[in-house]
Design a protein with these regions (language model features):
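Gly/Ser/Thr-rich active-site loops/lids in small-molecule metabolic enzymes
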Residues: 104-140, 145, 187-202
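Active-site histidine-anchored catalytic micro-motif
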Residues: 2-37, 86-87, 100-127, 150-151, ...
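Glycine-rich beta-strand-to-loop/alpha-helix junction loops that act as flexible
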Residues: 1, 92-96
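Short, catalytically relevant binding-site loops at active-site mouths
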Residues: 96-99, 107-108, 174-175, 216-217
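ATP/nucleoside-binding phosphotransfer catalytic cores, i.e., glycine-rich phosphate-binding loops
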Residues: 154-224
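Catalytic cores of processing enzymes, dominated by hydrolases/peptidases
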Residues: 122-163, 168-169, 181-182
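Conserved acidic residues
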Residues: 85-91, 164, 207
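Ligand-binding beta-strand-loop-alpha-helix segment within the catalytic cores
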Residues: 12-89, 146-147, 211
């Protein structure tokens, strides 16, 4: 998804020297220790965005990854930037179980109200929903469920829904009419805000959500 951003930033010779980035999540263990290598989101961001930008890239000191020691610094850093006039843009996808970042639906049951839930800035070593693991096996691990970590570090509602603007994408369509994301998209847009469906708060933010036509339905059985 970064290919065109890289293309136009380089074509127009636009510098990212005033851009600050905060990766929303990272694979981790129960203690928040993160993975390295090709499967990590840090590696993906560096290889798809930062490195291809060359001289136009985001300064290294402005790059934030959801590591155990760095994730807790996000609220203060973001608040300071916003106080200085920065705009916070949320770039997101919608998970199979309607998570944003890795803020899973079952976390909602831990709180007595949406207001309390909305005040959570991040979580280290969060346990992932089984369908989240299966989704990532399909999309990122070439079907190898056993390679997908069961936990992750993630930002929470307090940070994601403080965004001034949101840009989302839903492209969970496979071949021959198969897909995994249609119901998740419908729930996001039609259910109404609730802490039990994280992405249901997305329509409360200004922004744009791009989706593939087939995800819009009808969501009817079709033998493949």
């Amino acid at each position: 998804m970064y290919k065109w951003a890289v293309y136009f930033l380089k074509e127009w010779n636009e510098s990212c020297e005033n851009v600050w980035c905060f990766n929303m999540d990272e694979w981790a263990d129960g203690d928040g220790n993160t993975i390295t290598g090709e499967a990590s989101f840090q590696s993906a961001m560096e290889n798809a965005f930062y490195n291809p930008l060359g001289k136009n890239t985001v300064p290294v000191s402005h790059r934030n990854f959801a590591l155990k020691d760095n994730l807790p610094t996000y609220p203060e850093k973001i608040a300071k930037l916003k106080a200085e006039g920065a705009k916070l843009v949320l770039v997101y996808g919608i998970g199979r179980m309607c998570h944003i970042a890795f803020w899973e639906p079952m976390i909602g049951a831990e709180f007595n109200s949406d207001e309390e839930w909305l005040n959570q800035p991040y979580r280290v070593g969060v346990k992932l929903h089984p369908l989240t693991i299966e989704q990532n096996a399909i999309t990122s691990f070439r079907s190898r469920t056993t390679l997908v970590p069961c936990r992750a570090n993630t930002i929470g509602p307090k940070l994601m829904f403080a965004a001034d603007y949101a840009i989302g994408g839903a492209d969970g369509a496979l071949s021959r009419g198969m897909q995994w994301q249609g119901m998740s998209l419908w729930m996001t847009l039609r259910y109404g805000p609730t802490r039990y469906i994280t992405s249901s708060y997305i329509p409360t933010l200004p922004g744009k959500l791009f989706y593939l036509k087939e995800l819009a339905g009808p969501l009817c059985p079709d033998a493949n």
